[in-house]
Amino acid sequence: SRWDGSSKFQKENRWGMFPSAALAWRISEENFMESTRNWLSNLKLRASFGVTGNNAGVGPYDTQALANIKYYYNYGGTVANGFGYTMINPDLTWEKTVEFNVGLDFGLFNNRINGTIDLYNKNSSDLLMEMQTPFELGSYTGAIISNVGKVNNKGIEIQLNTLNVQTKDWNWETSFSFARNINTIKELNGGKEDLVGNKWFIGQPIDVVYGYKYMGVCTREEAQAFANDPNMKTKFYEGEMKIYDKDGNGEIN
């Protein structure tokens, strides 16, 4: 277990405890595996659990107000010095990731063939991300760093290495790898409400893209038909891309 501190956060959120543990079982060294030792060089099962903290993306003054006199404002034709206002978030804290990993290491024929298989499950909470905010709230950047929600990452990683030829003068080795990760947003701002402005949707990956379904290019005849159709609230013109009207009400929204 370890304690980490960061001066980027306020005093009450500065320190975080991040425990971890790991164990392994070298199965190939057990007595009941003695008959396999002429071809099985290594077989090890391992498991680990750990909590890690992240403060990347947080600036040294994101929890403290700054005054900057380099901003100028026009008041009735008179230019005056002013203070650029940056929104702060004094409640920022560590982003935490709890990870559980199970892995298998193996080696065959004096490790001429060897590899690893890893399964992992990560749950990240208090994600530190830039959240879009209306300019009228006082942020000239339109964004503020916040602890916004929870995300799950789970997947598999496979690595296979082979020593195909080994001579006094040269070796021929090959490596193969495969990885698959599934990223899912579980919670945002303590609830199940999507943050559309950030492209964050519950049950979907971070920064998933939603868009209209296009049905091809509008022809001259189709454009005339759209123009003459009183039920068609959204008009398409010649050369434009036609958008699929999912609910059939004549309006794209």
PLM segments and residue spans:
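Extracellular/periplasmic, surface-exposed regions of secreted and cell-surface proteins
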Residues: S1-K213
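Flexible glycine-rich, low-complexity coil/linker segments exposed to the extracellular/periplasmic environment
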Residues: K70-M87, F201-N253
